[in-house]
């Protein structure tokens, strides 16, 4: 049995909800995985994620197999709590974050963190600009007919046409061929040499 924790971002944030929904789909498809905590963290703060992790480590006698975080900062908080218990190793506790902050990519390279989700900036920016220009040039038309919408997501108030941009799961195996090869960070920044 694998004991997992989800460290969620800001309560009600659509990104936190979308990321967490994806994690839940995986958990539901794998009944041998047990979710022991699902905690939102106001402000996406690393220190709150660290405190949550410290409490869970105490409650479960340091027997946590994985922690999935909605952003890199909270993953750093989790790793700080794990480090204090000698558990900051992807071989001991699987930790994943999202944002690919430099420190987290360094943790992936060092083996402290298992994976980061990298949202490529160029496709995000290009899609945002194309969408904004199209909407500005056609203010009286329905966005769903103008844009290549991948799906509609209800944000709790309205249905939002959504364009999905690619993300990359970065781990030790593909770190050099993704983050470094595409120039997001340099070899020097990641490895310090």
Feature roles, as predicted:
Residues 4-193:
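A residue-level marker of the well-folded mature domains of exported/periplasmic proteins
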């Amino acid at each position: 049995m694998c004991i997992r924790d989800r460290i969620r971002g800001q309560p009600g944030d659509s990104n936190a909800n979308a990321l967490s929904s994806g994690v839940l789909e995986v958990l539901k498809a794998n009944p041998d995985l047990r979710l022991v905590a699902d905690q939102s963290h106001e402000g996406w703060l690393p220190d709150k994620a660290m405190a949550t992790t410290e409490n869970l480590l105490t409650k479960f006698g340091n027997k946590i197999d994985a922690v999935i975080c909605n952003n890199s900062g909270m993953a750093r908080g989790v790793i700080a709590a794990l480090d204090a218990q000698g558990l900051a190793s992807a071989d001991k506790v699987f930790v994943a974050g999202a944002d690919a902050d430099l420190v987290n990519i360094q943790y992936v390279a060092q083996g402290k963190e298992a994976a980061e989700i990298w949202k490529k900036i160029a496709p995000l920016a290009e899609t945002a600009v194309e969408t904004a220009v199209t909407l500005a040039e056609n203010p009286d038309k329905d966005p769903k007919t103008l844009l290549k919408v991948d799906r509609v997501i209800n944000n709790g108030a309205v249905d939002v046409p959504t364009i999905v941009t690619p993300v990359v799961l970065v781990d030790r195996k593909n770190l050099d061929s993704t983050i470094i090869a595409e120039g997001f960070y340099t070899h020097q920044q990641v490895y310090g040499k």
